Amino acid sequence: MPFLKAFKRTLKCTSATLLLSGTLLSPASADAISTDQATALIAALTDQLVVPAYTELAEESSQLVEVLDSYCAAPNTGDRSKVETQFHSTMDAWQRAQIIQFGPIYENKGPARIQFWPDKRGTGQRQLRQVLNNQDETVLPSGALAEKSVALGDLQALEYVLYNDPELTTQPDSFACHYALAIARNQEVHAADIVQMWVGADSYRDQVLNAADGTDVFFDEKEAASRFLNDMAGAIDVIRLQKIDRPMGLTITGARPKRTENWRSGRSLRNIQLNLESVQHFLAVEDGFGDVLSDIGKETTSQAAQQLISEILGHLAAFDQPMSKLVANPDARGDLESLLTKLRSLQSLVREQLAQDLGLVPGFNATDGD
């Protein structure tokens, strides 16, 4: 598998160097969990969360193709609500899987191929407008979008086509509708490829589950467990920094509602909820982080994390406006600041206390430097 060869030298040599230099773990924390516990942990997270999440994404993406194919055959008389419902189901599946920031997702252009966001320079929107304005049919043939900019074939592009000017997809023989279908087909193929890389021949799953023996990807089982821990912490950082703090701005006058994720389809809060539920599942699944913490006498850490996640989810459920309106609402500012404080506490709890209790070391993530 190409990505295994690409990662082999860097990951194994870096891990070995850090371990030998004593910079990864102190002697007291290095043995916090046993080889068997770490192996059971990574197996549980892989088989109960990661593989099912990508399988769901592949299934929903395939269903999206079917719904759009049927609708685009006669968009002027079709039921657009079915398209929107399936778009949301597909995006739900992606938001559940979004926490996973390693492995096959980084094969061929990375997570941006599924969702190019945030688009900080507006590059994607400019490309999309050009395609739609020119009715550029080079995006329509099978496989064409896989060779073009990720911003033209991802779920953000699909949201733009469906929601920026909905009337475009309702016209007979609509270019916009055909383009939406091409995007859906692009996502269907990509999601199926990811599942195949996780569970097919010479699979990434095998590389994870056999980490204790040393594989092309992981030096040992604790490096693999640390990778999962890092994704928990990274997901919390993305929520805090990119999905809430960035659109809020430093002051109410600096708020930028259109920086909220998926503001056109009104699902910014839903995305955050699903991301947090994935973090929660990493703790709550059988043989997951929560069970391991209990096994080593650190159940108070697990309980504190789960309690804080429940509080944050309750906080989100109390909002009665979309995030795009909340960030520009002076009356909501205090509630959003309180939410950010809770997320900072959760991030510290996971990255510091939970990691210390387990003897694991989370590394860098996508938000470092933001």
Q: Model segments located where?
A:
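Mature extracytoplasmic or organellar-lumen-exposed domains after removal of signal/transit peptides
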Residues: 32-370
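C-terminal segment of classical bacterial N-terminal signal peptides
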Residues: 20-29
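Bacterial N-terminal signal peptides that target proteins for export
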Residues: 2-16
